[in-house]
From Swiss-Prot:
PANTHER family: CHROMOSOME TRANSMISSION FIDELITY FACTOR 18, DNA LIGASE. The keyword Lipid biosynthesis does not apply. Pfam families: BRCT, DNA_ligase_aden, DNA_ligase_OB, DNA_ligase_ZBD, HHH_2, HHH_5, Nlig-Ia. It catalyses: NAD(+) + (deoxyribonucleotide)n-3'-hydroxyl + 5'-phospho-(deoxyribonucleotide)m = (deoxyribonucleotide)n+m + AMP + beta-nicotinamide D-nucleotide. Transmembrane segments: none annotated. The active site is at K118 (n6-amp-lysine intermediate). PROSITE patterns: BRCT (PS50172), DNA_LIGASE_N1 (PS01055), DNA_LIGASE_N2 (PS01056). Its cofactor is Mg(2+); Mn(2+). InterPro entries: BRCT_dom (IPR001357), BRCT_dom_sf (IPR036420), DisA/LigA_HHH (IPR041663), DNA_ligase (IPR001679), DNA_ligase_AS (IPR018239), DNA_ligase_CS (IPR033136), DNAligase_adenylation (IPR013839), DNAligase_N (IPR013840). This is DNA ligase. DNA ligase that catalyzes the formation of phosphodiester linkages between 5'-phosphoryl and 3'-hydroxyl groups in double-stranded DNA using NAD as a coenzyme and as the energy source for the reaction. It is essential for DNA replication and repair of damaged DNA. One of its GO terms (biological process) is DNA replication.
Length: 777
């Protein structure tokens, strides 16, 4: 403690002392003083700041106590998405992952990986500007999270100010908030003493504590933060490796898990995995596996991402926990697509940190395969957040009165017929929108964050709206009045007004999200986006023939049929028309993709027709390619086919034209192909020239600094629409660097390499030239 009589110097000295002790305790795992001494100095600082309020600083340790409760959390758009990871469940899958890495990098050398325990907590993003913590956010759906800055400031292992003078201008840190076992036990003891509900496991306790609207509650909870990556770095030289990045985070005062190691090759990874697995029960926090990441950042950039996960990382999951219990009964749930799912009602049992009383049985085939009966003693499996499932029965313990399990003959909800094709695993209710459960689940899906993202419209409110018969379809949501909503239980005028405002805000939505929200069978986010990108507008998708749908990336035969069947159903068409009439406006380019139109050749149409059942058996793709290039139109092909054998182009075997003539005459295939051809011609007339639609093809762009009019993720998507590859670091292959406010080391490197640099205004001008609004992405 300082003896200086200047209060400001005293306060600064006390803050420095406490921050240094916190760094020694949390980062170096080397406590410098007993807790009692820390508490004495903390009280001295608190007393001094109370005497001189002007001396309180944002990074003072006394400011971790929490603030007045919030009404709700603000939404935060992640500039760099917080992605999930692919999983490996055994050694073979890990070897396969390593093989994919080396093949994609085209290297034969052994790869260095960073191996780290996979903490079972809540993923969090911390944003520092000029060393000060300015924002903390939850992962959310990876694109949008919640602003938890006030709560994060109460966590002792979260630095309010980065350590040292040489800190980045802008740093986004990713990590995990966990609750240690000892703290969890103490918290539950307090809950029990107060007559409150106990937490099932440390993960639930951590998540519930971090998402408290009253940060004073968060401050009272024993939470800890471990940093594991950085998403943004400006004003500081980017480290060359992941391990060097972790060293930098430690130097700046962030806590990094002490178990993390650099491993040379897969065998070293497996040794690390086994070591952590053996150490697992002795750790003071929950882990559910190990994460492996390619150490070199340049290799990470080269490997890139697939869908919602990086190619350069994988989670090696631990074996799941299993327990025995008794199957008391089976209920059948109906999902939004009508699928019937059997749910096991179990004698409650403690599995993997939670009490399990329900578990999935998957489907009737699985029940029969496992010969599971009501009354059986069964094995229940649970891994992390995976829904518990019954994996087998113990016939030797089967009671004499055990009952078999049969598929219901009619829907347990609406009484409609249950249909199941001879080759179908899933049985479905045919009730459609008259089935209350299907209607209910379809509306919940429509409102969900990854779909229309209607803030405040949660599952319980949807249940209430359906139960009160205020809505029967998703279009009815946009006909709701505030007074109708305000009359519901636990809803008031303010909540009702907020919901109506959220519904209004959701009307402008990307076409891909809109298609996903409709809940078309087998259509996920990626397929919905591909449909939007290929066709360019909703009307074209609604009227697209199966022959064209099959040409869309990732659309197979069953998916194409599902899309066609959905838009052919009059009830679905009425719902879509109702949404449009209420002002819902799906946003897209308005024109088909030039690359997609170019792919719709006569040969492609013939291949699609073959998959749909046109009798082209024995005619291979090579022959179809020759026919498609030799004849310009379906009419020309039909005329040649009518000539029969001998009219085949070179490279096509004799007899094909005779077979083709017969096939074209069956089931109106000639007319169907000609209709598709006309659609293609119309799309070609509306599509931009290919070079105009992909003006940045083959170029690598880099984004740096803060963009003001849209996020970096939106800018990235917009550039990708123009054909550019967006990289995370500057190299000699970079074509352009977009520099926003506070651009740092990337800008400096670009200037040193003589790479062209543009600002946000120039980027926006380029995007406007090509009709792209990044704010709508």
């Amino acid at each position: 403690m300082t003896n200086n009589n200047d209060p400001s110097l005293q306060a600064q000295s006390l803050r420095d002392q406490l921050n240094d002790w916190s760094y020694r305790y949390y980062v170096q795992d080397d406590p410098a003083v007993p807790d009692a001494e820390y508490d004495r100095v903390f009280r001295a600082l608190k007393d001094l700041e109370a005497q001189y309020p002007d001396l309180v600083t944002a990074d003072s340790p006394t400011q971790r106590v929490g603030d007045v409760p919030l009404d709700a959390f603000e939404q935060v758009q992640h500039e760099v998405p917080m992605l999930s990871l692919d999983n490996a469940f055994d050694d073979e899958e890990l070897w396969a992952f390593d093989k994919r890495i080396r093949e994609r990098l085209d290297v034969s050398e052994i790869i260095d990986y960073v191996a780290e325990p996979k903490l079972d907590g809540l993923a969090v993003s911390l944003l520092y500007e000029n060393g000060e913590l300015v924002r903390a956010a939850t992962r959310g759906d990876g694109q949008t999270g919640e602003n938890i800055t006030v709560n994060a400031r109460t966590i002792r292992s979260v630095p309010l100010k980065l350590r040292g003078n040489d800190v980045p201008k802008r740093l986004e840190v990713r990590g995990e908030v966990v609750m240690p076992h000892a703290g969890f036990e103490e918290l539950n003891a307090r809950q029990q003493e107060a007559g409150l509900k106990l937490f099932a496991n440390p993960r639930n306790a951590a998540a519930g504590s971090l998402r408290q609207l009253d940060s004073r509650i968060t401050a009272s909870r024993p939470l800890e933060f471990y940093a594991y990556s950085m998403a943004q770095l400006e004003g500081w030289e980017h480290p060359p490796t992941h391990s060097a990045m972790l060293d930098a985070l430690r130097d700046w005062g962030l806590r990094v898990n002490p178990e993390i190691r650099v491993c040379h090759g897969v065998e070293a990874l497996l040794r690390f995995y086994q070591g952590i697995l053996e150490k697992r029960e002795h750790l003071d926090y929950d882990i559910d596996g190990v994460v492996y990441k390619v150490n070199r950042f340049d290799w990470q950039d080269d490997l890139g991402f697939v869908s919602r996960a990086p190619r350069w990382a994988i989670a090696h999951k631990f074996p799941a926990q299993e327990e025995l219990t008794v199957l008391n009964g089976v209920d059948w749930q109906v999902g939004r697509t009508g699928a019937l799912t059997p749910v096991a009602r179990l004698e409650p049992v403690h599995v993997g940190g939670v009490i399990v009383s329900n578990a999935t049985l998957h489907n009737i085939d699985e029940i029969q395969r496992l010969d599971i009966r009501i009354g059986d003693t069964v094995v229940v499996y649970r891994a992390g957040d995976v829904i518990p499932k019954v994996v087998r029965a113990l016939p030797e313990r089967r009671p004499a009165n055990a009952q078999g399990i049969a598929l219901p003959s009619s829907c347990p909800v609406c009484g409609s017929e249950i249909l199941r094709g001879h080759d179908q695993v899933v049985a479905r209710c045919t009730g459609g929108l008259i089935c209350g459960d299907q209607r209910r689940e379809a509306i919940k899906h429509f409102a969900s964050r990854r779909a229309m993202d209607i803030d405040g419209l949660g599952d319980k409110l949807v249940d209430a709206l359906v139960d009160q018969e205020l809505i029967t379809t998703v279009a009815d949501l946009y006909r709701l009045k505030a007074e109708q909503v305000a009359g519901l239980e636990r809803m008031g005028e303010k909540s009702a007004d907020n919901l109506i405002a959220a519904l209004e805000a959701s009307k402008t939505v990307g076409l891909g999200r809109f298609l996903f929200a409709l809940g078309i069978l087998q259509i996920g986010e990626e397929t919905a986006k591909n449909l939007a990108d290929c066709f360019g507008d909703l009307d074209s998708i609604r009227h697209a023939p199966l022959l064209l749908l099959l040409a869309v990336p990732d659309v197979g035969l069953e998916v194409a049929k599902a899309i066609g069947a959905f838009f052919a159903e009059s009830d679905n068409e009425a719902v879509i028309d109702g949404l449009l009439a209420q002002g819902v406006s799906p946003q897209a380019s308005g024109v088909p993709s030039a690359a997609f139109v170019k792919s719709l050749t006569l040969a492609q149409l013939l291949k699609s027709a073959k998959r749909l059942g046109m009798n082209l058996e024995g005619i291979g793709d090579k022959s179809l390619d020759i026919l498609g290039s030799h004849f310009r139109t379906v009419t020309e092909l039909s005329a040649a086919a009518a000539e029969g054998a001998g009219a085949e182009p070179k490279g096509v075997r004799s007899g094909v034209m005779t077979q083709l003539a017969k096939a074209l005459a069956e089931n109106d295939w000639r007319g169907r192909l000609q209709d598709a051809e006309k659609k293609v011609a119309d799309m070609a007339a509306r599509a931009p020239q290919e070079m105009e639609s992909q003006p940045l093809e083959g170029q690598t762009w880099v984004l740096t600094g803060t963009l003001e009019q849209f996020t970096r993720n939106q800018a990235k998507q917009a550039l990708q629409q123009l054909g550019a590859k967006v990289a995370g670091s500057v190299s000699k292959n970079t074509r352009m660097v977009v520099a926003g406010a506070s651009a740092g080391s990337k800008l400096a490197k670009a200037e040193s390499l003589g790479i062209e640099v543009c600002d946000e205004a120039a980027l926006l001008s380029l995007l406007n030239q090509h009709g792209i609004d990044p704010g709508a992405l």
